Amino acid sequence: QGEVCMDNIILRCDNNINGIFTAIYDAFVYKNQMQKENHEVYRDNISIEIGIGGNYSLFSKMIDIETDEIKVQKTILTIQKKLGFKIYETVFDALCHYSDNRATIVLGFLVRAFKVGQRIMEHMTDKYVMEVFELSRKVNKEADKIRGFIRFSDNGNYLLAHFEPKCDMIPVVMWHFVDRYPGENFVIYDDRRRHAVVHPRLKECFYINEREFKQLERSVPVKTDSFEQLWKVYFEHTDIRERFNPQCQRNLCPKWYRKNMVEFT
């Protein structure tokens, strides 16, 4: 990894789960190296910056991190083995939040968790512990909505769903739809982050980027889904006009989800 001579280190990683897990792995390498060289207690002086850009500091060492699948798997297995699957899920969900500080928060959480083990759940007064659980809670709250709001259309070759979640929802909700539609070809595209997950019938899922998704769209003839119109008619004719409450509807189904819900288009 090279010598570390600065008091503060900023690790800059790719803007995805694997990039962050790689940075977390390297953060612990640097942390252990700094403690060995300086014989001091770690002071949370390593942070993780996600994606390009960000603020530079004259008093920090900026290190670019290249995503490494081996480091990703080692990090995941270590968390699961030492802290348990429940805490791993909490960490994973927190990393799917949109906060720019989510990786640094999770790093601070893991530094503390590896010291006390699963008893970290009892340390809710700690800033990092509290923030990780809060990020995870918000991600799960949105995931509950997404599972109900996502809409698939059938183009004759596969089912396609578009959505624009605030958090990175594909890693969180895709297994719900894999379990629900194991025998279907389907694609879920995140218009905000411009990537998609593809589920071939009875096979493993994989990710594609925006360019690959556009190629997939062009390769399939446009076909109207007749059930879309039937669903619109059903939606419009099953409501009770006397009980129409737009404010309540907005609370239960916020407007930013409706763009990709066929009954509102």
Predicted regions and their residues:
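Long, compositionally biased intrinsically disordered terminal regions
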Residues: 185, 196-197, 216-265
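N-terminal ordered "arm"
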Residues: 6-67
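Short, hydrophobic/amphipathic alpha-helical patches that form generic packing surfaces
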Residues: 19-30, 107-109, 172-179, 229-236
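Glycine- and acidic
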Residues: 6-11, 159, 213-216
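Charged, alpha-helical interface segments at or near domain boundaries
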Residues: 47-144
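Internal, well-folded beta-alpha domain core
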Residues: 3, 119-207
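Acidic, Ser/Thr-rich peripheral helices and adjacent loops at domain boundaries
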Residues: 61-67, 203-216
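Short, Lys/Arg-enriched, disordered terminal segments
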Residues: 1-8, 264-265
